[in-house]
Amino acid sequence: MARNGSLEEFLGVAVDAAKRAGEIIRKGFHETKHVVHKGQVDLVTETDKACEDLIFNHLKQHFPSHKFIGEETSAATGDFDLTDEPTWIVDPVDGTTNFVHGFPSVCVSIGLTIGKIPTVGVVYDPIIDELFTGINGKGAYLNGKPIKVSSQSELVKSLLGTEVGTTRDNLTVETTTRRINNLLFKVRSLRMCGSCALDLCWVACGRLELFYLIGYGGPWDVAGGAVIVKEAGGVLFDPSGSEFDITSQRVAATNPHLKEAFVEALQLSEYVS
């Protein structure tokens, strides 16, 4: 049950925050970026920090009793505590590497969990002005129009999305590429857009039939898109086929017709060389 407001109110405030942050992203997209390396290939910019501050300040003004988890604050400390309390989970710039390179797949992702369940989701792509929204039990929308997952039922006719992450040790790279190589024999083609949140939304609106990612950064990568996928009629689960856990850094999404075949293909891809 919502606390300190209705779910519609939560969504409205989150949309406002996402659009304000999106304006910062849009203005900075073609400018010179001041980049800091979080790891070998993981980047953060001044825009990430400015957007997270803006979003949290806006949300805290409206919902001061809520909890807050953000990529730039939580990832930096390696510490976040997801409780049953209403918790806003934010990735201020999902697709920072794209942003740095001027590659137009960048978004703001804002999710609200209540009882650890993704309940409200907002994903805003300011470069092409696409706003994905969802409320648990009330549908998913793209720029105010209802969206649904693809009705495709054949794996071989399906478009698969994934990402390669930012870890570059030999074992991770070998495992990732082996998995992709094996899956390519099962699907029509593969896409990597560089944003987990957008990948999930593209499943929700039918642009992708399949998506999986193993080893993403944290709950901020999926909190916004998770409820949007479910409300669009999709299914969200662990790549092993078990129940999705927002804190596990493992996610897969598709439509109900493809889930069984997709899980089988994912499992086989782990062992076939």
From Swiss-Prot:
It is an enzyme of class 3 (hydrolase). Mg(2+) 2 binds at residues 91, 94, 221. InterPro entries: IMPase (IPR033942), Inositol_monoP_metal-BS (IPR020583), Inositol_monoPase_Li-sen (IPR020552), Inositol_monophosphatase-like (IPR000760), Inositol_monophosphatase_CS (IPR020550). The lineage of its organism: Eukaryota, Viridiplantae, Streptophyta, Embryophyta, Tracheophyta. Its cofactor is Mg(2+). It catalyses: a myo-inositol phosphate + H2O = myo-inositol + phosphate. Mg(2+) 1 binds at residues 71, 91, 93. Substrate binds at residues 71, 93-96, 194-196, 221. Belongs to the inositol monophosphatase superfamily. The keyword Magnesium applies. Its EC number is 3.1.3.25. Keywords: Hydrolase, Lithium, Magnesium, Metal-binding. CDD domains: IMPase. It comes from Solanum lycopersicum. One of its GO terms (biological process) is inositol biosynthetic process. Expressed in seedlings, flowers, young and matures green fruits. Detected in roots and stems. This is Inositol monophosphatase 1.
